[in-house]
From Swiss-Prot:
InterPro entries on file: TAL_effector_rpt
Annotated segments matching region Disordered: 13-85, 175-205, 571-611
Sequence ranges of the Cryptic repeat repeats: 321-354
Location, primary (coarse class): secreted
Skewed-composition ranges (Pro residues): 67-85
Ranges spanned by the short sequence motif Nuclear localization signal 3, renumbered to the chain: 583-586
The encoding gene: rip19
Domain notes for this protein: There are at least 4 possible nuclear localization signals, both N- and C-terminal regions contribute to nuclear localization.
Induction: By hrpB.
Motif interval(s): Nuclear localization signal 4: 620-623
Designated name of the protein: TAL effector protein Rip19
Source organism per UniProt: Ralstonia solanacearum
Cryptic repeat - repeat start and end residues: 286-320
Keywords: Host nucleus, Repeat, Secreted
Lineage per the UniProt record: Bacteria, Pseudomonadati, Pseudomonadota, Betaproteobacteria, Burkholderiales
Length: 720
């Protein structure tokens, strides 16, 4: 046997295949025997486990081991050679096993082949693997007893008296590794996962499956009177407890529904079944409904157990609580609140606190009742004095709603909140603590601004008086912001100064400027465009592309700007944008005949169907009473107000009054007040709107619903 220098493993020249091993008297062959085709995984494991030392073989860095007896060999054609160490007697039952490798006359079934090796964890794991593989490869000639059960937790084989007395099972387990130390998880042998190396499934000594238990208990619960709906809603782990304590609980007066509610905390079933007589004796007024409400909570069993020793003391002086009050504290405050209430009952009711039993119950009857009671006991005298000046009712309210943390925040920050710049009264500080707790108090302390939220209510009928406030900035605010940017000496610093001057945030100021046609880049740079450009941008948002050839006078002259605006809105380019196709000159028969056919009513007297573009418009906007306005009154509306209200002319009206509109080949979608429409003489100037026009403008401008502002504020913005 020689030791390889590269790999560090022992290279054995002696195989454990006993029919191929030479007698020990022959000179040792140092050449490695090639693996035979008949060698399986068993022979490979035998070679790995044969780590003994041959005689007179020195070992580097260690003392020479004791001479180990060689492995005896029994050739098929020669009698077995004598061994140096006497062999142990063979078991009597070995002839029952017939295998070509482990025959009755072979010495391969020796019980202890590695008696001289120390029982290390690694060798023990390998021995277990060898033993399991040997069990899988043996072919018994007679039926063997059942496979010994295996411990499910450790994987160790459990032998009873019958299996220990069996010579076959006893010979399969090496005695040298009967009780070795357990191998670490990293050193355990890995089980092969291939299909050809299938391992026998172990038999575990465990309880039946949970589904089997559920089916068995289901039948018991049905026999006890529970409905299938009740059983379906129960937890799986509570079924056996219900079946166990059902008789006791029903004998105490609890119904099936009460037991199902108690089972939400399955530990409470046992507590109620055992301690109900004591609870009834300590609190005679405590009803079963109170017990059910307490027991079904998250830690209801603990609350009931904590209530037993202190129930009598809580009903006595100084608190003199009723059974319902005690049940409320136990249900919501649970065991910590009950224990704190019992411990502090005298301190809370005596001087200097003088709390009433109702106040004590209110503080303790919520999650976190114990720390709230302790905080009130410690901080109430301090919060009553200067500079806090809080009343007892305010402190109790804060403790009931927000708890201990809010009281600590008030004690830490209220002196600062009472001073400038906050200057808050004690009532406001108490209200803030009740609403938001500690977080709200700390936010106000850090300077959280309080913003007024204006809610806009849209009324169905117009009400005489000032116009309602719009959702967003007022016209005065818009004018002030624009004037601030125009009057600023350093445009690049204007945006930063505006944030501080108007006390607003960056997104809010950007939204405000965007509502009047200023982009974000322009706002950050402080370059506010003139009114004409901003108006063109607002028209673009509404879907109207400005004409390219429109003249734009100086914004200093408001009258000139209004005239330019009229020319822009009444230009043929603006009118052509709303039409489906540009106007083309066609013969009279091709331009009028199709329209006359569509305007002609059918034989049944039904009105003709509307135009396709009007159908699309009617799908976007509901028809109102103003859609039946006369054509002449609609023509008198200024173009700068009613551009885009394309439902002012109906097919019926156009049939009744054919005129120059039809010859001009126009449609309701392309109505514009330019060269295509001839106004009747005597009508007012389109540039001077009347009061009725202004009212209609406030009601339905641009076909997008009522707006919240008038024309006056728009003129103020244009002047800025």
């Amino acid at each position: 046997m020689r030791i390889g220098k590269s790999s560090g493993w022992l290279n054995e020249s002696v195989s454990l295949e006993y029919e191929h091993v030479s007698p020990p008297t022959r000179p040792r062959d140092t050449r490695r025997r090639p693996r035979a085709a008949s060698d399986g995984g068993l022979a490979h494991l035998h070679r790995r486990l044969a780590v003994g030392y041959a005689e007179d073989t020195p070992r580097t860095g260690a003392r020479s081991p004791a001479p180990r007896r060689p492995l005896p060999v029994a050739p098929a054609s020669a009698p077995p050679a004598p061994s140096l160490v006497p062999e142990p007697p063979m078991p009597v039952s070995l002839p029952v096993v017939s295998s070509p490798r482990f025959s009755a006359g072979s010495s391969a079934a020796i019980t202890d082949p590695f008696s001289s090796l120390p029982p290390t964890p690694v060798l023990y794991a390998m021995a277990r693997e060898l033993k399991a593989l040997s069990d899988a490869t043996w072919q018994p000639a007679v039926p063997l007893p059942a496979e010994p059960p295996t411990d499910a937790r450790r994987g160790n084989t459990v032998f009873d008296e019958a299996s220990a007395s069996s010579p076959v099972i006893a010979s399969a387990c090496p005695q040298a590794f009967a009780s070795p130390p357990r191998a670490p998880r990293s050193a355990r042998a890995r089980r092969a996962r291939t299909g050809g190396d299938a391992w026998p499934a172990p038999t575990f000594l465990s309880r039946p499956s949970s589904s089997r238990i559920g089916r068995d208990v289901f039948g018991k619960l049905v026999a006890l009177g529970y409905s299938r709906e009740q059983i379906r809603k129960l937890k799986q782990e509570s079924l056996s407890e219900i079946a166990k304590y059902h008789t006791t609980l029903t004998g105490q007066g609890f119904t099936h529904a009460d037991i199902c509610r108690i089972s939400r905390r399955r530990q409470s079933l046992r507590v109620v079944a055992r301690n109900y007589p004591e609870l009834a004796a300590a609190l005679p007024e405590l009803t079963r409904a109170h017990i059910v409400d307490i027991a079904r909570q998250r830690s209801g069993d603990l609350a009931l157990q904590a209530l037993l020793p202190v129930a009598t003391a809580l009903t006595a002086a100084p608190l003199r609580l009723s059974a319902s009050q005690i049940a409320t504290v136990a249900q919501y405050g649970e065991r910590p609140a009950i224990q704190a209430l019992y411990r502090l009952r005298r301190k809370l009711t005596r001087a200097p606190l003088h709390l009433t039993p109702q106040q004590v119950v209110a503080i303790a009857s919520h999650d976190g009742g114990k720390p709230a009671l302790e905080a009130v006991w410690a901080k109430l005298p301090v919060l009553r004095g200067v500079p806090y000046a809080l009343s007892t009712a305010q402190v109790v309210a804060i403790a009931c709603i927000s708890g201990q943390q809010a009281l600590e925040a008030i004690e830490a920050h209220m002196p600062t909140l009472r001073q400038a710049p906050h200057s808050l009264s004690p009532e406001r500080v108490a209200a803030i603590a009740c609403i938001g707790g500690r977080s709200a108090v700390e936010a106000v302390r850090q300077g959280l601004p309080v913003k007024a939220i204006r809610r806009i209510r849209r009324e169905k009928a117009p009400v005489a008086g000032p116009p309602p406030a719009s959702l967003g900035p007022t016209p005065q605010e818009l004018v002030a912001v624009l004037h601030f940017f125009r009057a600023h000496q350093q445009p690049r610093q204007a945006f930063v100064d505006a944030l501080a001057a108007f006390q607003t945030t960056r997104p809010a100021l950007l939204r405000l400027l965007s509502s009047v046609g200023v982009t974000e880049i322009e706002a950050l740079g402080g370059t506010i465009p003139d009114a004409t450009e901003r108006w063109q941008r607002l028209l673009g948002r509404l879907g109207f592309r400005p004409a390219t050839g429109a003249a734009a006078p100086s914004p200093d002259s408001l009258q000139g700007f209004a005239q330019s605006l009229e020319r822009t809105l009444g230009s043929p380019g603006m009118a052509g944008q709303s039409a489906c196709s540009p106007h083309r000159k066609r013969p009279a028969e091709t331009a009028i005949a199709p329209r006359s056919i569509r305007r002609r009513p059918n034989n049944a007297g039904q009105p003709s169907e509307p135009w396709p573009d009007q159908l699309a418009w009617l799908q976007r906007r509901k028809r109102t009473a103003r859609s039946h306005i006369r054509a002449d009154s609609a023509a008198s509306v200024p173009a700068n107000l009613h551009l885009g209200t394309r439902a002012q002319f109906t097919p019926d009206r156009l049939r009744a009054e054919p005129g120059p509109i039809m010859q001009a080949h126009t449609s309701p979608a392309s109505v514009s007040f330019g060269s295509h429409v001839a106004f009747e003489p005597g009508l007012p100037d389109p540039g001077t709107p009347t009061s009725a026009d202004l009212a209609s403008f406030e009601a339905e401008p641009f076909g997008v619903g009522p707006l919240d502002f008038h024309l006056d504020w728009l003129l103020q913005i244009l002047e800025a």
